[in-house]
């Protein structure tokens, strides 16, 4: 995996860039992605390792917020409520965060969102391509601060929808074996 560090001003005008989201704070990375999509109409952005994105805040508070939002969906007791659906999977959560930063009611925002792809882990066809790190916010820096509290999107997903997370984890193990076979490692 080749990692290249760049700032937002140094991004190419067209083509496709792959951003490794490992250890990034979800909101900060989303602002960079949204701004790049709006400023460069011929640039496609692919974000990989979405499950390793970080949400800052107390672990229990963040998980309870997601659980509360999901429980506000239509229920047996309140069948009339059909409010906004909150995604559970980390890739969809990040895409939803970016969508909130784009002007989705006009054509520019909708086309920008169509040019964004978000994946959990790294797809096989993108293994040997250059990954881009926009800025340095590793988990180690978050752990150094004594009051810094954070939770990864994978942990949130595990606490919200354990069955789906467990199924993904099993598929991930099979995927890792396949990658080793393909790369010869």
UniProtKB/Swiss-Prot annotation:
Any GO BP: translation
Ribonucleoprotein among keywords: yes
Keywords: Ribonucleoprotein, Ribosomal protein
InterPro entries: Ribosomal_uL13 (IPR005822), Ribosomal_uL13_bac-type (IPR005823), Ribosomal_uL13_CS (IPR023563), Ribosomal_uL13_euk/arc (IPR005755), Ribosomal_uL13_sf (IPR036899)
Domain of life: Archaea
Subunit structure: Part of the 50S ribosomal subunit.
Function: This protein is one of the early assembly proteins of the 50S ribosomal subunit, although it is not seen to bind rRNA by itself. It is important during the early stages of 50S assembly.
Protein name (Swiss-Prot/TrEMBL): Large ribosomal subunit protein uL13
Gene this protein is translated from: rpl13
